[in-house]
Amino acid sequence: MLLAYYVPSTGIPEVSFDIGESYAGQIPVDWKKTGSKDPKFFYWFFPTVNPAGKDDVVIWFNGGPGCSSLEGLTQENGPFSWKYGTYKPVPNAWSWHKLANVIWVEYPIGTGFSTGHVTAKNNTETAAQFVEWWKNLVDTFGLQGKKLYITGESYAGVYVPYVGAAMLDKKDKKYFNVKGALYYDPVMPYADKLRLDHAAFPGFFRHWESVFAIPDKNKKILDNDNEKCGLDKYREAHLTYPPPPAPWKPVQVKGCDITAHFDEISTVINPCFNVYHVQDTCPVLWDVLGFPSVQYTPPGATLFFNIPGVRKAIHAPAAPKEWASCSGPVFVGDDDRYDPAEHEKKFQTLVEKTNNVMIGSGMADYIITSNTTALAVQGLKWNGKQGFQTAPSAEFVVPIINNTESNVENWAGGSVQGSVHSERGFTLATVKTSGHMVPQYAPPAAFRQLEHMLGRVKSLTDAEPFSVNISTSFKWPY
């Protein structure tokens, strides 16, 4: 059966190098139901050749809901990298499969090449569907008893706790031996009506003010919004250590919609403003995946996963005819029926049963700002207490990388990359130079965080060398 999923390591269109052993295709949720309307998840699996990672399996989800994890594989943490604005794919020195077996899954059903009739009404049902499917994948590749680590970004802030809790609730280490989780710039467990994003915005704006280049008259509007609704005062009152007891009153936004006023002027000043990475400016760069912030496909261009030879190599289905980075609906009625209280319980289960959960937050992300995440954390309860009890103060340190002329395509920054703080089995880290997709914008930072979750390095606060050589070789030793 494995041969049916085997992906040739060479000869993938546009990829001019050996990507190593991998397997891809669809596996049904139920082997007895394999018709065109029956649910099947699409995955791409890269086994590791690192002896230290043979018993570790990392699952990666992108967000949305309905955004493809093939985006994560191709532009963030997979073996080959084709980031927007670049000429062609290159080997990714920061590929996560250098540390563990990694499986990128298009989740939920209705995303990308994961096809079938959408029946899930909420995240509990999508997680249950995934858990059922996961057993089939484990049996297909003989992954019984492996240690599982669930990772992702954005709306995967919902996926990861729901899937993790559903697996842990099974109490079956043969198939669901969950040992930790790592996810980035996530949707956090709080009600939208709290409007924590508004309370976090003034500080975010001040941090990036020189980048935004907003005219003085517009800055006065933002200042008035802040003053009228007490946004800084709310943040100062709630982003404390320890925090005030939850539940909290919502942020006042009536008559002072600060983010709407910012949105009105930001794209006038910078028409190419990228909500996922605020340092971006014009021109809009061609993205072979047609994403993220400003979708632009030059005439005659084809998205990478719509190239016939690529689809053939990875055993993609004939439908959908046009793959897209984000698709859907993935819930019945296109409504996830989000329940923040339930989400918090899933988060608690994941943390309390693994004591190995980390959230990373890119400080150049406007969609979910770092202080929005920090505020949300202070409103959550886990392992007997609410929020962090002491203020984050430690520096998040990444070993300095040897950037040379021979590895320009993988140049990346090291040294102090942000902050990190841990209490009661949960860690929050910020990454100064990253936007929404930390493995894309700051790959060494994400690589380091994965090393730490897997137990390969002891600390995120010193420059202990990486556990593997950083090179573009996928053969052991690297």
What residues fall within each predicted segment?
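Catalytic-loop region of hydrolases
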Residues: 1-57
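Accessory cap/linker subdomain of secreted extracellular hydrolases
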Residues: 11-12, 57, 65-81, 85, ...
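N-terminal cap/lid subdomain of alpha/beta-hydrolase-fold enzymes
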Residues: 37-124, 375-378
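Short mixed-charge
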Residues: 78-98, 172-177, 382-424, 473-477
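Gly/Ala-rich beta-loop-alpha elbow adjacent to hydrolase catalytic centers
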Residues: 106, 152, 156-160
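Alpha/beta-hydrolase fold nucleophile elbow
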Residues: 141-155
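Short glycine-enriched nucleophile-adjacent loop
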Residues: 157-172, 181
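Alpha/beta-hydrolase-fold serine-hydrolase catalytic core, especially in secreted/extracellular enzymes
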Residues: 243, 256, 411-478
